[in-house]
Amino acid sequence: VIKRIKKTGNFANRFAIELLNKAFDKQLNILYETTFGNIETAINLLDAFKEKQYQIYVIALPINIELSILRNQQRYESKISAGNTLPRIVEREVIERMAVNYQQCLEQLRQDKYIHLYQIKDHQEVNQIVRSILQNNG
């Protein structure tokens, strides 16, 4: 059973964890999307899957810091235009730090023999990786 991480007290996190625990109880296959920007969060999440004896496949997407900054700016401007939500801009340093944390997290996960880590370098690799996972799984 996953417990809420102290640093993350938002509704979305609590809701996701409740759904995940229900899926564990029903022994469902689970697809979980996360940024893995924090190794503690990643380990907490993956340990829960290991305890339940799940096969774990991590598909890591490439990082493009400049594109992340551009999309952040576009979201900010879109929210200002909409006028119905509070816009929030993430500073460049925060995005860069998250990118470094993500890479460090992947390096640590790569060392774990219970985790099948696939790193996508370009979109052409996606089908190849999916075929590989399906062949290894069944």
Regions found by a protein language model. Give the residues of each.
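Conserved phosphate-donor/acceptor-positioning beta-strand/loop module used by diverse small-molecule
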Residues: 50-72
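Conserved nucleotide-sensing/catalytic segment adjacent to the nucleotide-binding pocket
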Residues: 1-50
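Hydrophobic anchor at the start of a short beta-strand
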Residues: 30, 53-56, 117
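Conserved GTP-binding G-domain of TRAFAC-class P-loop NTPases and closely related GTPase folds
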Residues: 70-138
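Conserved nucleotide-binding/hydrolysis micro-motifs of P-loop NTPases
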Residues: 37-38, 62-67, 124-126
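A signal for specific C-terminal beta-sheet/loop modules enriched in small/flexible residues
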Residues: 48-53, 57, 132-138
